[in-house]
Amino acid sequence: MFPDAVTERGRKHILELAAMHDKGIHTGVLFLVHWDKAHWFLPDYHTDPAFASAFAQAALVLDWKALALRWDARFTTPMPVRLLTYPEEILRQENEDRGDYMVVLQLAADADISIGAKGQIHFPKGYYVYTGSAQKNMAARLARHQRKRKQMHWHIDYLRQHCSVTAVIPIRTTADLEHDIARAVDAIAPWHIPGFGCTDCRCASHLFGFEDNPIHRSDFMQIVEDFRMNRLTVLMQ
């Protein structure tokens, strides 16, 4: 999936190429994927939905291709492996402002925090991963979680007053993955806060604690990759 960060310039370039096509100019794009095991290509709608929407529009008229490459051991000569397929139906289905998400927070010191009706809870210092979902307006929901000034509503709102947000990880999807994500993170987390953020489901928790930033853990990033990308292979079948 491309890009790995928001690219406003990339979005504009794609739309400019499409506009040139409309004027009768033959235009195209070549994406080189430096991973020889790749079989399909999609714009990363989780990271940059605006670019993904622009790509979906422009792909209909551009002469474009995505090519997987294999490098030799000395990293001097790339070898073409295969042209990648474009599962555009996945993009049409999944690129919406809804889905599931994880918010990574840092608590600098041990704290006893009042969490609404749950009362006071002890939180060891460290990093916390909160899992949630939004059936619509997910971008606005994530922006809200990052603000401190707001009316208290969810459990996470109370904790946010004492933490800094280090990452937000949207997983745009029409599927209901929130509880699967929570169970996956729970399986690798050293501890969780019982009953946090899960009053409407049977999960043990939706808040999971780590001594160090989970963004730097391979098992956590594997969860991100699995829910953002690897599960799409099943949908394609």
What is the predicted function of each stretch?
Residues 1-8, 15-47:
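Nucleic-acid nuclease catalytic cores
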Residues 64, 93, 135-220:
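Aromatic/basic micro-patches that form nucleic-acid/chromatin recognition or nuclease catalytic surfaces
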Residues 34-90:
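Domain-level recognition of nuclease-like catalytic cores that cleave nucleotide substrates
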Residues 83-150, 167-176, 215-237:
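GIY-YIG nuclease catalytic motif and its immediate N-terminal context
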Residues 24-27, 62-63, 126, 163-166:
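Short glycine-/polar-rich loops that comprise or flank the Walker A/P-loop
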